[in-house]
A protein has these predicted regions:
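Bacterial lipoprotein signal-peptidase II cleavage site
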Residues: 17-30
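Extracytoplasmic small-molecule ligand-binding "clamshell" domains
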Residues: 47-127, 205
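Ligand-binding clefts/hinges and TM-proximal coupling segments of bilobed small-molecule sensing domains
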Residues: 52-53, 99-102, 178-202, 276-313
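Bilobed "Venus flytrap"/periplasmic-binding protein-like clamshell domains
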Residues: 63, 67-70, 78-94, 150-210, ...
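Periplasmic-binding protein-like
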Residues: 67, 145-152, 238-278, 297-313
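Extended ligand-binding regions for polar small-molecule ligands
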Residues: 86-96, 155-159, 165-176, 181, ...
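Acidic, polar ligand-binding/catalytic clefts
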Residues: 90, 102-168, 247-251
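A ligand-binding cleft/hinge motif common to bilobed small-molecule-binding domains
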Residues: 110, 116, 124-136, 185-189, ...
Length: 313
């Protein structure tokens, strides 16, 4: 009896154990499958998060500017980057959330060398357009202001000299200009347009600003081709280095020469984004607002109407 019962039980027991084994294997496989899927989902989510983070990462941009070209670019009493051009780029920065601008004050020489080498991404120094410079840097289509140029002359001649044309008729006896300077080219272009009354254009090496003013006061020359902010800062301002000449010298505006930010050649995407922002700021009147704040007048009104990058001035 016992032997027969045991023989009957053993096959049944083996069947049950086999079923448990199959069930356990199935459960383990299912668990493994779920875990693998969960791991894949987690990896995908992490990948998507990483991609999103990369796409939205803020790019830091180094904006170099000159240290003491007041009021265009300078370092204020608090040690902060300031000036008209810096203010324009701070306004641009607010419009471009994908970028964060860091301002670096430096010399004009280091600015150009560093910008070309990629040390800086943007350079601000009241730059005029030249074909030679455009070979090294990116100019946007939109300028951001101008350098107002004209002549400093003896106040005693104010009835006869009111602009560059009347000065040319008066004598045209101009303080010599370096032939490498953009001012030299401007007077050359003036003479082409006024062949009957040209200005005496004499090439010269660099000289001290005080010499130019003194030569005019002495009568050696009748005018000095100068930038208005330089005249205002050095002669008109009460703390100007040559304020003692303020009652003896006057200034007559010729025209506004557009100024531009420069971009490293590898930063075309940044240049395009900033160019679009400049156009919008100009349209909204923000540039005129900043001009009035830093200069007390419009730096746009004396730019020749219809001027485009590359036009003769």
């Amino acid at each position: 009896m016992k032997i027969r019962s045991l023989a009957a039980i053993i096959p049944a027991l083996l069947l049950v154990l086999g079923g448990c084994s199959n069930s356990s294997s199935s459960t383990t496989a299912a668990d493994t499958s779920v875990a693998a899927q969960s791991s894949a989902d987690s990896s995908m989510a992490a990948s998507e998060l990483e991609t999103g983070s990369s796409d939205s990462e803020v790019k830091k941009i180094k904006v170099a500017h000159t240290q003491s070209y007041y009021p265009y670019d300078f370092v204020n009493d608090k040690g902060e980057s300031d000036g008209y051009e810096v203010a324009v780029f701070k306004a641009i920065d607010e419009m471009l959330p994908e970028y964060e601008f860091e301002y670096v004050s430096t010399t004009a020489e280091d600015l150009l060398i560093g910008l070309e080498a990629g040390k800086y991404d943007v350079g601000l120094k009241g730059v005029w357009w030249t074909a030679e410079r455009e070979e090294k840097f990116i100019y946007p289509e939109n300028y951001i202001g101008s350098s107002v140029i004209g002549i400093a002359f003896r106040t005693e001649n104010a009835n006869e000299i009111t602009d560059l044309e009347s000065f040319a008729r008066y004598s045209g006896n101009l303080v010599p200009i370096s032939p490498q300077s953009a001012q030299y080219t401007i007077i050359e272009n003036f003479n082409k347009e006024h062949p009957d009354t040209p200005i005496k254009l004499t090439p010269a090496d660099q000289f001290e600003l005080s010499d130019a003013y003194q030569w005019v006061l002495e009568g050696r020359y009748d005018a000095f081709f100068n930038i208005k902010v330089s005249f205002d800062t050095n002669v008109v301002a009460e703390d100007g280095e040559y304020h003692q000449f303020a009652d003896k010298l006057s200034f007559a505006t010729y025209k506004g020469i557009p100024i531009w930010p420069l971009f490293n050649k590898e930063k075309s995407e940044l240049a395009t984004a900033c160019d679009d922002a400049i156009a919008k700021l100009k349209e909204e009147g923000k540039l005129e607002e900043l001009s009035d704040k830093y200069f007390g007048y419009s730096v746009f009104k004396d730019i020749p109407e219809g001027y485009k990058k590359g036009d003769d001035l």
